[in-house]
Curated annotation (Swiss-Prot):
Origin species: Mesorhizobium japonicum (strain LMG 29417 / CECT 9101 / MAFF 303099)
Leading EC class: oxidoreductase
Protein name: Histidinol dehydrogenase homolog 1
EC number: 1.1.-.-
Annotated family: Belongs to the histidinol dehydrogenase family.
């Protein structure tokens, strides 16, 4: 992709933080300088944020041999707009009311795919597994081993609990697997078989009793590699269904598909909106929007590495934000140059370039404290840390989907093979939740028992008075009757129990 004429506009977000965001023109109305005629020249404009930028002359520095790109044109919008919500709700209603007939109609309409039954037979599944080359099967097995091993290690940390909190009072909890889980694996544009590992395998390790999976056809046929991954991960039922109709079929059930209790897995905006609308009818893993990547780097790495990692995630989609936070201006400018170079050779440049053009951002800070603060503010899905002391960010950051520490690892490793789950929070949801993991498929359910009459009377005494403080007479009487029966005390109906 040829470099676009333009400049980088740098309004400081704080006294020290400096943000480099692509701009096609300077926002300072008093500045008439244009740079489009010199595509290898980058102008860095510094404007006092405490004054009206339109009334202040620009300070300019020219740095040679740096490519420039266009401005960020907006922010990613997650969640459906009114039209999308209405359209998705209509499709959900069709499946709820029409069952298998509606599922078939929608599959033909959207995927041009028709079958008598969308559930694959054992023979079809075996054929998909057998279609793998030896190398492909070994690679799939290796990836699934890593994901299974880490999920099993996580599961081992989730212990049931039982404790005697007072003499004769026993409290506890059990981690109970969700019984029926539906896993969605996207595959319309790319056959994202890694999502089969991340959802099906994790649910299997959690101990879910029934795991069904849906994936759309790929290029008009059953997506063989996805089906193989689903089967090897341990799916009990595999359906060649995509989009809203797949999510609806799993949530509502049809004549031939028993409903599930939870739906997990990423998808496009319509799939995400369907999950949002169905939340409450079924559980979901999280609301997933466009892929986000944040690279935090200093001058211990070079621009080629940073640019490669930014574009490697930007190719997910034209609305995938890719951000660099650095304390090295040289690295920032080198990264811009490398992005320009790589976009001339990257096969997915059409997508990655659009994402970088519209949602790319570089934030230049002076201290690691500022870098941490900016990263926590962004609360990005993926945060890759390539600094001299990456553990500083591990110990300091609070808002992120997953951290990738050091230059030896990267987000792609997490997406495909290293073992951590790639289904992660987006749109700043990392402020309040982590990503998909084995614990998402478990319900931590509490229980209690009282072993002695004395303990029942003691708890009943407090329960009686506390209930009446809130005005709940029936609650109080539940306590009182036990104080009478197990404590031998004469307590009037709906009266508080006097302390001994």
């Amino acid at each position: 992709m040829p470099p676009a004429g333009g400049i980088f506009h740098r309004p400081p977000t704080t006294r020290k933080s400096r943000r480099l965001t692509p701009r096609s023109a300077c926002s300072n109305s008093t500045c008439s300088r244009t740079w489009g005629e010199q595509p290898w020249l980058l102008a860095l404009h510094s404007i006092d944020s405490d004054r009206n930028a339109g009334r202040r002359p620009c300070k300019r520095r020219a740095i040679a041999m740096i490519r420039t790109i266009k401005s960020a044109r907006g922010s990613v919008v997650n969640g459906g707009n009114g039209a999308m919500t209405s359209a998705v709700q209509t499709l959900l209603d069709q499946v709820e009311q029409g069952g298998d007939r509606a599922v078939r109609e929608l599959s033909i309409r959207f995927d041009k795919f028709d079958r008598d039954s969308y559930r694959l037979t054992k023979a079809e599944i075996d054929a998909c597994i057998n279609s793998l080359t030896g190398r492909e099967r070994e690679d799939l097995d290796f990836a699934q081993d890593q994901i299974r091993n880490f999920a099993e290690a996580q599961r081992a940390t989730l212990l049931d609990l039982e404790i005697e909190t007072l003499p004769g009072v026993v409290l506890g909890h059990r981690n109970v697997p969700i019984q029926n889980v539906g896993c969605y694996v996207p595959g319309g544009k790319y056959p994202l078989l890694a999502s089969a590992h991340m959802t099906v395998l994790t649910a299997r390790v959690a101990g879910c009793e029934r795991i069904i999976t849906c994936a759309p056809p790929f290029q008009g046929k059953v997506a063989e590699k996805i089906v193989a991954a689903q089967a090897l991960a341990g799916a009990d039922e595999i359906y060649c269904l995509g989009g809203v109709q797949a999510i609806a079929a799993m949530a509502y059930g049809t004549e031939t598909i028993a409903p599930v209790d939870m739906v997990a897995g990423p998808g496009n905006a319509y799939v995400a909106e369907a999950k949002r609308l169905l939340f409450g009818k079924v559980g979901i893993d999280l609301f997933a929007g466009p892929t986000e990547t944040l690279v935090i780097a200093d001058d211990s790495v070079d621009g080629e590495l940073v640019a490669t990692d930014l574009l490697g995630q930007a190719e997910h989609g034209v609305n995938s934000p890719a951000v660099l936070i650095t304390n090295s201006e040289k690295l920032a400018l080198d990264t811009v140059a490398e992005i320009g170079r790589l976009l001339t050779i990257l096969p997915t440049a059409a997508i990655a370039a659009k994402a970088w053009e519209d949602f790319g951002e570089i934030i230049l800070c002076e201290t690691t404290k500022e870098m941490v603060a900016e990263a926590d503010r962004l609360a990005s899905e993926h945060v890759q840390v390539m600094t001299r002391d990456p553990d500083h960010f591990l110990n300091s950051m609070r808002n992120y989907g997953a951290l990738f520490l050091g230059a030896r690892t990267n987000v792609s490793f997490g997406d495909k093979v290293i073992g951590t789950n790639h289904t992660l929070p987006t749109n700043k949801a990392a402020r309040y939740t982590g990503g998909l993991w084995v614990g998402k498929f478990l319900k931590t359910c509490t229980y209690q028992r009282i072993l002695t009459d004395e303990a029942s009377a003691l708890i009943g005494e407090y329960g009686s008075r506390l209930s009446l403080m809130e005005g709940f007479v029936g609650h109080a009487e539940q306590s009182n009757i036990r104080v009478r029966r197990y404590g031998g005390r004469n307590v009037g109906y709906a009266m508080p129990v006097d302390p001994r």
